[in-house]
Amino acid sequence: MSGNTLGTLFTVTTFGESHGPAIGCVIDGCPPGMGLTEADIQIELDRRKPGTSRHVTQRQEADEVEILSGVFEGVTTGTPIALLIRNTDQRSKDYGNIVETFRPGHADYTYWQKYGIRDYRGGGRSSARLTAPIVGAGAVAKKWLRERFGVEVRGYMSGLGEIDVPFVDWSHVHENPFFSPNAAVVPELEAYMDALRKDGDSIGARIDVVASGVPVGWGEPVFDRLDADIAKAMMSINAVKGVEIGAGFESVAQRGSVHGDELTPGGFVGNHAGGVLGGISTGQDITVSIAIKPTSSIRTPRRSITKAGDEATVETFGRHDPCVGIRATPIAESMLALVLIDHALRHRAQCGDVETPTPKIAGSAT
C-alpha cells in the first residue's frame, strides 16, 4: 500500500488501523519556530472524536494525542513531527460475522481482491477512524496558516438527508453536535436522526468549508492546480462521493454573464469561482462543499457474497455512525488546511519574490 502520503513540501503520512494498538501520522516539512503543544492539537481532535452525542458512534475513544518528535521546548524544530493516538475501545468481536463475507458499500471486497488479505476488524485501514490523524495534522496546518497569513479555515453542515440547513451565523456551529450554523434547525435534525436510528438505517450529509484570508497566488498549474489538489484531498476522506468548488454543479445552469466574477478597483463582484481561477487562488474566500454518502454499516439485512462467491446476507452489528457527516466538519477543515499550507510553502519557494505593478484587489467589492 503506497498511497498513504498527502502533500509535496508539507507532507502527512498516516499509519495504523481501526482496531490496532494505535493510529497516527508523521508530518514533514513544517516550518521551524512555531509554538506547538499537544493542547493545540487536542482541541481539534475533541471536535471530531466519537461518543460525543447519541447521534454518533458510541465507541468511546479519548483520542489523546502524543507528540513524539519534531517539537523542542514547545517549538517546532523543522524536523518530522510524529503524532500518536492510542486506540482504547476496540470491540473486535462485533465483526466476527463478516470474517468470510463482504459488507455492501464498504471496502471489504476491494481490499480483499487487491491485496489478498484484509483486516475485517472495523474495516482496518479503510476505517474512518484514520481521519483522526488527519485532524491532528490539520491542527498544525491551521495554526501556521493563521499565525503566518491570518488564514481561517471553518466549516459547517449545510444539509442532512432531505433537510437543508440555511447558514445563519458561525457562532451557532460550535453549540450543537451537528456543526449546524442554524440553531433553529437542530431540533429537526435530532428528531430525524432518532427516527433513522430506530429504523436501523443511515443517511448522508453535505459539508461546506470556507478558507478566509488566503492571498492571491497559491496554486501550481497545470496538474497541481489548487482546486485540483483540494478536490483530491476531499475525495480522500472516507465516504465522500462528490466535491464542489464555488458554484460547482450549479455552474451548468448559469450563463457566463452571471458566473464570471467581475473585477473592479474596489474588488471582485461575486465568487462563483470559489476563490480559484486557473488553479490559482484569487484572494477571495475559498469555498468547498462535499457530499458524504450514507453509512454502509446498517442493521438492515443486505445481500452480499462470501469469499467463496456464494450468496450471503449481511447485518452489521458494531458501533457505527448513522451519519458519518455529523463528525466530518473538522475533517474537511483539516484537509483544506493541509492543501493550503502545502501550496503556501510551494508558492514561497518559487514565486515568493514576485511583484507586479497591479494592486491586489479586495475579495469582495463593498
From Swiss-Prot:
GO molecular function: chorismate synthase activity; FMN binding
GO cellular component: cytosol
Binding, FMN: 125-127, 238-239, 278, 293-297, 319
Catalytic activity, EC: 4.2.3.5
Reactions listed under catalytic activity: 5-O-(1-carboxyvinyl)-3-phosphoshikimate = chorismate + phosphate
Job of this protein: This reaction introduces a second double bond into the aromatic ring system.
Protein name as catalogued: Chorismate synthase
Gene: aroC
